[in-house]
Each structure stands twice: as C-alpha cells, then as structure tokens.
Amino acid sequence: MDSISLRVALNDGNFIPVLGFGTTVPEKVAKDEVIKATKIAIDNGFRHFDSAYLYEVEEEVGQAIRSKIEDGTVKREDIFYTSKLWSTFHRPELVRTCLEKTLKSTQLDYVDLYIIHFPMALQPGDIFFPRDEHGKLLFETVDICDTWEAMEKCKDAGLAKSIGVSNFNCRQLERILNKPGLKYKPVCNQVECHLYLNQSKMLDYCKSKDIILVSYCTLGSSRDKTWVDQKSPVLLDDPVLCAIAKKYKQTPALVALRYQLQRGVVPLIRSFNAKRIKELTQVFEFQLASEDMKALDGLNRNFRYNNAKYFDDHPNHPFTDE
C-alpha cells in the first residue's frame, strides 16, 4: 500500500482506488470551489471521486473531470466515479431515471460505481425530502430487493460498472445477499466510519462477504451546522490521536486516514484547501505499528456525527438495530 494509484479488487472483478475524494459541499462553500478542488485533487493523484444526486454538485464535478481529460492529465478509464441513488427514486421503474440524471449532469457515459444512498424510500417527486402539511416526511414502502434488481439492470445496461449500497446495516445487507435470483452482490457498503465509530463488526461482516467497506466522515466531520451537533467531539483534537501523530511526525488527519487504510477500509476525504489535499496524499509514506493501531482501536465510542435524524421513524432506518 505505497501509492495513491493503488486499487483493490471488488467482488465483480472491477477495481476501486484505495483512497477517495468526497464532493459534498457545506452551505458556506460556493459550488465553483468544487470544480477547483476536484481539479487540484486530480493534479495531486486522486482518481476516485465520490458524489451523489443529492449533493447537487455533479455538474461541477463532471466539468472538472472532463477538463482534466481534455488537457491530457487523465483518461476517462483512469477515473473512478461514484454516484448514489436518492431515496425518492427507489421504485424499480425510477432507478434508471435517477442514474440517467447523473449521467446527464456529469456528461459521463457511465459511472464506475452506483450505490443506494440509504435503505429508506421516500415518496417520488422533485423534492429531496417530501413532507406533508405537518412537516412529516412522506415515507414510501418499496422492497429493497426490488430496488436492487433495478440496480442490476443498470449494470447490465453498461450505465454502471459496479453497484453497491450505503448506510445499510448487516440485516439489510443480508436481505439482498439472500435474495432469490441474486445476479450481483453489492461490491461495497459506504458508511460513516472513523476513530470514534470504527465499525469493527460491520467491517468483519463485509470482509466475510467479500464486500468493501468505504468510509465517510473519515476525519470526523466538517462541523456543518445543518447536520452536525456543534457540541459533538472534534476527532482531530483527540489527545491519543495527537500523541501518536507526534510520535510519527505526521498530522492527526494523516494518522486517522492511515488507520483506515491499514484496516482494509477504502476511506473518503474531502477538502477545499490545496495544501491540505496535497498533504493527505502523504498517507502512503508511513505505516502505523500494531501497538498504535490497537491504541487507535481503543478510541471507539460508537459515536455518530451523521445519525440520519431526518429519517427518524422510518421503518427501514438502519441505525435502529444498534
């Protein structure tokens, strides 16, 4: 594990770069910053880009990728682009529609990975979070196995090279894996995963099923007031993490990132700062000793920054199993 260009095999024979660049945008950041950050990331060796229909920045990310293809920095096949099916498109007949919207926005012919963003379905329409007159989210009952069959058809049509899931618990993954007539297993489960929520059980489960665990909020969170409790702990200020970082003469962010790579997790990072983006590529220049990995394991407190409270009361809420 010595290079940002390294890829690991997925269970369908495709390969995913071991380090990804996330494209969610906090409210305070202008969308054109996404174009700039994506180009900087490509120039610094990033090839794996994670986005979603929900993020409303796919046009900008696509523009940045295409400009770096046009100037000869990369070829399309060098880039691994992930997008996500939003909850208002879970009906089987709507799955391809959502993916086609992504392809139109990015102006790409296919996505490398298409994943179900959440296991919870919402009523279809143009609004991301449809609500009734009392402000209650309008849930929809769609069998996740039916949604998965439509995802399989997107892969067969060549619109998505690989398909996976996000924010699923083990029980929900089992439903798909045990589905009669299953054609393709999910290649990944993308979940919140960091030192305070190390997802050791989910990681063991995914490894046992040949499913890659992809982590978001890898370095904690951006403290975005729209979804993060401002009283929540600041991960990168953790004294144990900072002491280990000092020992290796690295930043706490690099140690938190290296921890995930050594566990076999594919971490996503996000930054709009050119210096920070370049710094994070140095994660391949050192290795953590086993005693330090154990010390970092000990920081787990099963703490979520993203508790998906907006989906509270949904019968398929994944975190109610915990």
Curated annotation (Swiss-Prot):
Binding residues for substrate: H117, W227
GO molecular function, one term: bile acid binding
Protein name, as recorded: 3-alpha-hydroxysteroid dehydrogenase
Catalytic activity: a 3alpha-hydroxysteroid + NADP(+) = a 3-oxosteroid + NADPH + H(+); a 3alpha-hydroxysteroid + NAD(+) = a 3-oxosteroid + NADH + H(+)
EC number annotated for this UniProt entry: 1.1.1.50
Function: Besides being a 3-alpha-hydroxysteroid dehydrogenase, the enzyme can accomplish diverse functions: as quinone reductase, as an aromatic alcohol dehydrogenase, as dihydrodiol dehydrogenase, and as 9-, 11-, and 15-hydroxyprostaglandin dehydrogenase.
Positions carrying Blocked amino end (Met): M1
Pfam families reported in the protein's UniProt record: Aldo_ket_red
